[in-house]
């Protein structure tokens, strides 16, 4: 009988450019997408091409109704901050996004708590930018001619 070949688990090694001097900040970009159904916290390198960490509120809580809650966003942000510290990222630029388009331009309930949790976990915050898509001339909004009747 021949020996069975087993695959060893593949370990990704992420390097963030050249070596960093003492006291120098290594920046990442954290994209926070806060809708009213979930909160996504997605960390990339400065170019935005390489995903380093991506955690959602739904990965942290069991009940579907709690996915967008501030508590779930806080847990997700703490996980993201811990993983970033392992990778050597010490500072972040924040890009905050709501649903936008012809839907609501207001960020969901998890946006503020995610940002606070990142700041409290020891991450330096560089710039905070709102990147909610704003329509210049949009498709027709949902609700019909007479709008949504309450």
From Swiss-Prot:
Give residue numbers for the modification (Phosphoserine): 19
Gene Ontology biological process terms, A to Z:
translation
Q: Does the keyword Cytoplasm apply?
A: yes
- InterPro entries, alphabetically? Ribosomal_uS11, Ribosomal_uS11_CS, Ribosomal_uS11_sf
**Compartments (UniProt record):** Cytoplasm
Cited Pfam families = Ribosomal_S11
List the Gene Ontology MF annotations in alphabetical order: mRNA binding; structural constituent of ribosome
A GO cellular component annotated for this chain's UniProt record is: cytosolic ribosome
Look up keyword Transmembrane and say if it applies.
no
Keywords attached to this Swiss-Prot or TrEMBL record, sorted alphabetically, are: Cytoplasm, Phosphoprotein, Ribonucleoprotein, Ribosomal protein
UniProt main location, coarse: cytoplasm
Q: Give the quaternary structure.
A: Interacts with AAK6.
Q: Member of which family?
A: Belongs to the universal ribosomal protein uS11 family.
The UniProt entry, under NCBIfam families, shows: PRK09607.1
The molecule here is called Small ribosomal subunit protein uS11z
Instruction: Look up and give the organism this protein is from.
Output: Arabidopsis thaliana (Mouse-ear cress)
